[in-house]
Amino acid sequence: MKHHSRLLLLPLISLGASAAMAAEDPKSGYYGAINAIETRQQAHNMDLSERPGIGSFVAGNEKQNFLNGSLAAGYQYGNGWRTEGEYVFKKSNEYTSGSSTFATSFNHMTTDSQRLMLNVYRDFMLTDKFAVYATAGVGIAKIDVGGWQGNDTRHFADSTQTNFTYSLGAGVSYEVLENLTAYAGYRYVDMGNVESGRNTFVNARGLQDENLRARLTNNEYLIGIRYTL
């Protein structure tokens, strides 16, 4: 997580804490929410992939930007705290890397990722309608990993992993109508390490000793609406 992203969280939390007594907390009750999420995903540490030992690692496309979404349901306790379950929709991406010896034969790592999270929120009411919030979440990410090398007949075996995942974030919210709140925020998500199976093709050394590895993280910018029953 970049330092500037962390610093963005501090003013929001400090502002909310200093004004925590400025307005009443919202009522308690169950709620549902829907989110649109602008995601900037990065595949870190691709140089840790098992390679044939010929040439040096060459970085390729390690970042993807895409729009995703999620659904959530939770409970608002009436004291500034909320908890919810959230499902983040499946999304497919592709990342590349190569070898200095085989300049035109890039490895293509494909990922299909989806998440189920338990999130905790602390709302700091600045007025009766406007609030800032901090959030943290833990959960699992199901990630299918595969890929190919050079051309799509040279496959790496598919692998499915279920990883521990965590998130940290902050944002602002506004009650636009009674029981209906709009919000916008940022969160950092770490989905852990992923890897494909080994190459199903025979490589330059006549062996099946390669795979594709990375650590997946997201910087997510979201807007959403929440309706409280």
For every predicted segment, state its role.
Residues S92, T96, V176-L229:
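Predominantly the C-terminal beta-signal and adjacent terminal strand-loop region
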Residues M1-S28:
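Cleavable N-terminal export/targeting peptides
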